[in-house]
């Protein structure tokens, strides 16, 4: 995955760095003890399913453009997934971060629409609720055993599409961070002791 602040890749579900078997074959070993937010283990079947649903032309996924170099994905065993590429691709490991691994057993049970309304992942925060055009709420997932566990119990993302509203929320300390700082507001925020990075 990519670290949200530094944008540097790190091992999220992988237990070790990707292993290059030959020019067009890579293997990924899953991290021991990784679970989804419903407590079920993350399996190689989930990884294969997650990639195949994006690569399936019938699904018309926009994410396919980021992994169009992948020919096929298969489970070697219960811990190792093998990727066959159409051609050698130096950014293979970085592009894997574009695909989020989802629990096949949940989507099979409830369907894609219900899953989209209440997604289940495997990261340090689990989905709690969402209010359209308002906010998304997450809470720490205690069993998470990855590199970056949650540092707070709860996190709310305010969905502020208006740039002026985002800046006002940041200035008033209603928010602790914001994205897409308008260029014209950078100096004003810095003058109010706000840290601005690009």
Language-model features: locations:
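Gly/Pro-rich hinge or "lid" segments in bacterial periplasmic/extracellular proteins
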Residues: 4-5, 96-150, 154, 162-164, ...
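Surface-exposed binding/hinge segments that line
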Residues: 29, 35, 63-106
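Short, well-ordered beta-strand elements
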Residues: 25-28, 47-50, 81-83, 123-126, ...
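Sec-exported extracytoplasmic/periplasmic mature domains
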Residues: 32-35, 52-59, 88, 97, ...
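Extracellular/periplasmic solute-recognition and catalytic clefts
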Residues: 54, 72, 128-137, 156-198
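Residue-level recognition of beta-strand termini and adjacent short loop/turns
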Residues: 22, 75-77, 132
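N-terminal lobe/hinge region of extracytoplasmic solute-binding protein
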Residues: 1-22, 26, 52, 120
